[in-house]
């Protein structure tokens, strides 16, 4: 069960990152298909967090190295993921 859920999450990240489906469309489908409650709220929160990801950053890792490329091209600094955000030249202090 956990493996299937993880695969679905990563497939969702891929689809959303390429812009085929936007966060707004996914949130609308969740509103229509899921009953109000914990599961709906959790699913909407996961979709929102994944949609906020910058330059492929997830869990402090830039999976496709877009953060590094972005920072090298704009500021000539190292790109470092801080959670879901990409920061140029700011090392993690934890």
Swiss-Prot record:
Organism superkingdom: Eukaryota
Disulphide linkage map: 57-81, 67-86, 71-88
Swiss-Prot/TrEMBL keywords: Antibiotic, Antimicrobial, Disulfide bond, Fungicide, Secreted, Signal, Toxin
InterPro entries, per database record: Long_scorpion_toxin_alpha/beta (IPR029237)
Keyword Chaperone appears in the UniProt entry: no
Transmembrane segments: none
Expressing tissues: Expressed by the venom gland.
Cleaved signal peptide residues: 1-18
GO cellular component term, pick one: extracellular region
Transferase among keywords: no
Residue stretches making up the BetaSPN-type CS-alpha/beta domain: 54-94
Primary location: secreted
Single GO MF descriptor: toxin activity
A Pfam family this chain is assigned to: Scorpion_toxin_alpha-beta
Compartment annotation: Secreted
Biological processes, Gene Ontology terms: defense response to bacterium; defense response to fungus; killing of cells of another organism
Role according to the record: Has antibacterial activity.
Annotated family: Belongs to the long chain scorpion toxin family. Class 3 subfamily.
Protein name per its UniProtKB record: Scorpine-like-1
Protein source organism: Urodacus yaschenkoi
Lineage, broadest ranks: Eukaryota, Metazoa, Ecdysozoa, Arthropoda, Chelicerata
